Curated annotation (Swiss-Prot):
Gene3D superfamilies given in the database record: 2.30.30.30, Nucleic acid-binding proteins (2.40.50.140)
Subcellular locations according to the entry: Cytoplasm
Record has Cytoplasm as a keyword: yes
InterPro entries: Elong-fact-P_C (IPR015365), NA-bd_OB-fold (IPR012340), Rib_uL2_dom2 (IPR014722), Transl_elong_fac_P/YeiP (IPR020599), Transl_elong_KOW-like (IPR013185), Transl_elong_P/YeiP_cen (IPR001059), Transl_elong_P/YeiP_CS (IPR013852), Transl_elongation_fac_P (IPR011768)
NCBIfam families found in the cross-reference section: efp, PRK00529.1
Function per UniProt: Involved in peptide bond synthesis. Stimulates efficient translation and peptide-bond synthesis on native or reconstituted 70S ribosomes in vitro. Probably functions indirectly by altering the affinity of the ribosome for aminoacyl-tRNA, thus increasing their reactivity as acceptors for peptidyl transferase.
Source organism (scientific name): Zymomonas mobilis subsp. mobilis (strain ATCC 31821 / ZM4 / CP4)
GO biological process, one term: peptide biosynthetic process
Protein family (similarity comment): Belongs to the elongation factor P family.
Keywords: Cytoplasm, Elongation factor, Protein biosynthesis
GO cellular component: cytoplasm
Broad class of the protein's primary localization: cytoplasm
Pathway the protein contributes to: Protein biosynthesis; polypeptide chain elongation
Protein's recorded name: Elongation factor P
Amino acid sequence: MKISGVDIRPGNILEYEGGLWRAAKIQHTQPGKGGAYMQVEMKNLIDGRKTNVRFRSAETVERVRLDTKDFQYLFADGDMLTFMDKETYEQISLPKDLLGDAVAFLQDGMDVVMELYEEKPISVQLPEQVEAEIVEADAVVKGQTASSSYKPAILDNGVRVMVPPHITAGTRIIVDVNTQEYVKRAD
């Protein structure tokens, strides 16, 4: 479906110069001279490249709708990850690169949402928050309790996060997958 430059919104998938791009940041600019345009920061869904493109309000671009399917993560085999379609029980293997930094939070049996374009997997969306265990945390320095200071800690998957002073090794916490930040203590 074709949309004009001013109708582009964050999260839209656009077909641009032969590739699929996800619009990330968008800024409407109206210079003193000349017509208004949308400055769009986009990320290529295939290779991860980022680019900035100006779309004039009169320009049109193809907005693509991706199909989504529920999958379950099964196992890793080298650089490949294997998922199972929850409806048909078919298995599909994808490269780890497709998940980027989020691959560290992938857990056996985790339910994920796969985005498909013309039946080909484009991206894998993990749950927004996952539970992880602290394996190492710095000790609290006396007198730091008055301010909201955070200390570094290492999770069971090797990811380093900043946590409140009361969190110790062995504590289970909830982590935001996208920002890789501490959310709260797990119940």
